[in-house]
């Protein structure tokens, strides 16, 4: 727990066997739940995840084909319940999970114990089919929301996000100064010195396109996936409707703007080490441009064409 706030961290991972173990080990102690989502990796990622949790106590393992149960409840489940263990998806064989704390395994502890802490921190999750980075994050978001996390951060499984600054990422949301906080590597030359010119150029193009589509004109570095969001914001935006591929981050910003949410950039230094970006900008930029054009038109329609969105708060978000 951090400042009387429960904190969940989603760690999406695809073929990150070389890094995922260190990422899990580095999760700060104030984190209540860490949802490590293996998005159908073909290397040893899953084995590395399990190796991190098996030496301790038995922990719940959720395997999801197409995500967790789509009929999740609207709020936290009662103590002792197991999110995604019941419902149509489970009945159809799409979701397998430990059902209870006795017999079939250890169920998810949906409520903290007497000391205010959750029994287990790491929750291993595995997709049976690859859904993309956004799909992995959505699965983590859904579980965190069901378990009643107040703030949910995202820390990639490639080791490029410094766990020592997680408190800085979540601070604006915890303090109530923002609904969504994200890292920004483009504040000054010292922060983006590690970025290649090609990566900088691609980021600049995507930043401009995302500003136009979202209306967040002071926002920079939209491809930065080091983020934090409040549970209330997740409920308002609607996790199920989010894009699941690499354009996930941009789609989130468009939807946040349509709902009048406050977004804050948190300065951070770029860290790459030996990891190469999975984004191929030659194909990604045109594809994302089409997505952002649709997002721009949708935002205008949602903001000014519907009566159930607070347009005053949207304008105040500038």
Question: For the regions a protein language model found, what residue spans apply to each?
Answer:
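Short beta-strand/loop segment that forms part of the nucleotide-sugar
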Residues: 32-41, 125
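Short beta-strand-to-loop acidic/aromatic patch adjacent to the donor-nucleotide binding site
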Residues: 149-160
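Hydrophobic helical membrane-anchoring modules
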Residues: 1-2, 243, 250-318
């Amino acid at each position: 727990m951090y400042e009387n706030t429960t904190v969940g961290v989603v760690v999406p991972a695809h073929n990150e066997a070389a890094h995922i173990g260190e990422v899990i080990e580095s999760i700060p102690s104030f984190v209540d739940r860490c949802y490590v989502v293996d998005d159908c990796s073909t290397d040893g990622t899953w084995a590395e995840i399990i190796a991190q949790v098996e030496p301790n106590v038995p922990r719940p393992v959720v395997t999801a084909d197409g995500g967790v149960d789509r009929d999740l409840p609207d709020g936290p489940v009662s103590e002792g319940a197991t999110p995604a263990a019941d419902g149509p998806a489970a009945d159809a064989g799409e979701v397998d999970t430990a059902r209870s704390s006795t017999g079939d395994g250890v169920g998810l502890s949906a409520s903290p114990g007497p000391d205010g802490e959750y029994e287990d921190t790491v929750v291993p999750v595995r997709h049976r089919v690859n859904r993309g980075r956004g799909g992995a994050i959505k699965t983590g978001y859904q579980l965190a929301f069901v378990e009643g996390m107040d703030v949910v951060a995202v820390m990639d499984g490639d080791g490029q996000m410094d766990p020592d600054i997680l408190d800085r990422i979540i601070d604006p949301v915890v303090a109530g100064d923002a609904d969504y906080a994200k890292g920004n590597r483009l504040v000054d030359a010292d922060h983006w010195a590690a970025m290649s010119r090609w990566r900088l150029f691609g980021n600049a193009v995507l930043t401009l396109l995302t500003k136009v589509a979202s209306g967040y004109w002071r926002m920079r570095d939209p491809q930065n996936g080091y983020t934090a969001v409040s549970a209330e914001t997740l409920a308002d935006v609607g996790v199920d409707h989010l894009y699941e591929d690499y354009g996930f981050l941009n789609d989130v910003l468009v939807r946040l703007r349509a709902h009048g949410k406050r977004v804050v950039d948190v300065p951070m230094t770029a860290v790459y080490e030996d990891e190469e970006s999975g984004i191929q900008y030659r194909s990604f930029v045109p594809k994302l441009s089409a997505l952002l054009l649709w997002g721009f038109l949708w935002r205008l329609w949602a903001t000014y064409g519907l009566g159930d969105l607070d347009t005053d708060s949207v304008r105040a978000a500038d």
